[in-house]
Amino acid sequence: MSIKTEEISSLIKKQLEGYQDDLAAEEVGTVTYIGDGIARATGLENAMANELLQFSNGSYGMALNLETNDVGIIILGDFDEIREGDQVKRTGRIMEVPVGDAMIGRVVNSLGQPVDGLGAIKTDKTRPIEFKAPGVMQRKSVSEPLQTGLKAIDALVPIGRGQRELIIGDRKTGKTSIAIDTILNQKDQNMICVYVAIGQKDSTVRAQVETLKKYGAMDYTIVLTAGPSEPAPMLYIAPYAGAAMGEEFMYNGKHVLIVYDDLSKQATSYRELSLLLRRPPGREAYPGDIFYTHSRLLERAAKLSDKLGGGSMTALPVIETQAGDISAYIPTNVISITDGQIFLQSDLFYAGTRPAIDAGASVSRVGGDAQVKAMKKVAGTLRLDLASFRELEAFTQFGSDLDAATQAKLNRGRRTVEVLKQPVHKPLPVEKQVIILYALTHGFLDPIPIEDITRFQDELFDFFDSNAADLLKQIRDTGNLPDTDKLDAQIKAFAGGFQTSKQLAAAKD
């Protein structure tokens, strides 16, 4: 039997042609320390900052400290099964979360995994949680209003699309209520909302989700929650994950509102991680880069240039103060990063002025350019009037006799405070806000007793809906104040037939 060498060589060639290289080079390290949501590993010399690393039990971590001898890793999720000596390997990917339309209406955790029991989220799009903020030339000036539906904000501290407006105040002063009401008011406004709950009790988040469902707001909202029972890394990455979800829509030319509730808890979790990773502590034991932690997050909110699609992301970060101290480290940091702040005072809140906005300490640095023209006209001096009223009110407590002009100022001030009060979850459309503020600033409310102001307002809105819907439509469509003679005539017609509580009581008797 003779073996033909040609056949053998052709067979070998065929085999070589069909050969597939299944070898994959992996960089694997060894865990040297594990505990408190932190791991240290050696042997990962080429790991990138914020790279996703996988442990042998399937858990993931993120490289946060890149040191000479080892890597400091924050563990995302359960770390009970990880032991010293376990293997950890590089994935070559930066930490990413799922994004896209499929996320809308869902409640997810910091990794984008659903926690609402409604099954898997069908999306194949992802975005890195850390992303470079748009540069100067990629942005555009804030020019479109973002209506919150709250008279006190839309009149005194207006917000524009693409702005960063801080909501700051002590605990239990209505910070979350303002954020939720703003989300509720975005219905039919072509906005997508992202609510990031950081360190909020699960029962509280459940209540917020139920509120959003009740008013139909979950149709355009993503809720991201990192509860207090979760490890610190989950709380730390939550706002960045939320920003990534919002950016997906912004870079596709859509408008996004994102609420970070609240960044004080995120700062605390980052301080915890930094101390565990042996980073040198600074003021109030926060690490040296705590300012950068918040600035790189909030700079991602922007109004993009027309070249990039003209989308926007408006950020409402929330900060909790201790005993009204806005000069503490984190509050001053975030105040200096944002384009203004809404300061809520507990004294006002307990006195029944809700939303409890301190007009003197609250400011919007860029929102005035975006304010509706009609609102600008009727609310132009409102902030100054309110601030001077507060001063006068303090002065009159000494019991001195007042001249007629001062008395008139006080009366107008008290009515202003009453008009700016608003029940929770009842946002008002801008045209109705303009009507009541016009009535206030033009003296139509001066003869009305304070206890009847709310009823006067509600009945005035009903009157306009029935008899002057064209004026409301004009404000809504054009943003301009209609003919003042027509407006005055309608308000006078209503005020002439309005009966005060005393008149109603007398009529009954």
Swiss-Prot record:
UniProt family annotation: Belongs to the ATPase alpha/beta chains family.
UniProt-recorded name of the protein: ATP synthase subunit alpha
Keywords, comma-separated and alphabetical: ATP synthesis, ATP-binding, Cell membrane, CF(1), Hydrogen ion transport, Ion transport, Membrane, Nucleotide-binding, Translocase, Transport
A GO molecular function held by the record: proton-transporting ATP synthase activity, rotational mechanism
InterPro entries (alphabetical): ATP_synth_asu-like_sf, ATP_synth_asu_C, ATP_synth_asu_C_sf, ATP_synth_F1_a_nt-bd_dom, ATP_synth_F1_asu, ATPase_a/bsu_AS, ATPase_F1/V1/A1_a/bsu_N, ATPase_F1/V1/A1_a/bsu_N_sf
Gene: atpA
SUPFAM superfamilies associated with the record: C-terminal domain of alpha and beta subunits of F1 ATP synthase, N-terminal domain of alpha and beta subunits of F1 ATP synthase, P-loop containing nucleoside triphosphate hydrolases
Natural source organism: Lacticaseibacillus paracasei (strain ATCC 334 / BCRC 17002 / CCUG 31169 / CIP 107868 / KCTC 3260 / NRRL B-441)
Enzyme Commission numbers on file: 7.1.2.2
Pfam annotation, one family: ATP-synt_ab_N
Organism classification: Bacteria, Bacillati, Bacillota, Bacilli, Lactobacillales
GO cellular component: a single term: plasma membrane
Gene3D superfamilies: 2.40.30.20, ATP synthase alpha/beta chain, C-terminal domain (1.20.150.20), P-loop containing nucleotide triphosphate hydrolases (3.40.50.300)
Site (Required for activity): 362
Residue sites binding ATP per the record: 169-176
Assembly notes: F-type ATPases have 2 components, CF(1) - the catalytic core - and CF(0) - the membrane proton channel. CF(1) has five subunits: alpha(3), beta(3), gamma(1), delta(1), epsilon(1). CF(0) has three main subunits: a(1), b(2) and c(9-12). The alpha and beta chains form an alternating ring which encloses part of the gamma chain. CF(1) is attached to CF(0) by a central stalk formed by the gamma and epsilon chains, while a peripheral stalk is formed by the delta and b chains.
Membrane-protein topology: Peripheral membrane protein
Catalytic activity: ATP + H2O + 4 H(+)(in) = ADP + phosphate + 5 H(+)(out)
Matches recorded under NCBIfam families: atpA, PRK13343.1
Location in or out of the cell: Cell membrane
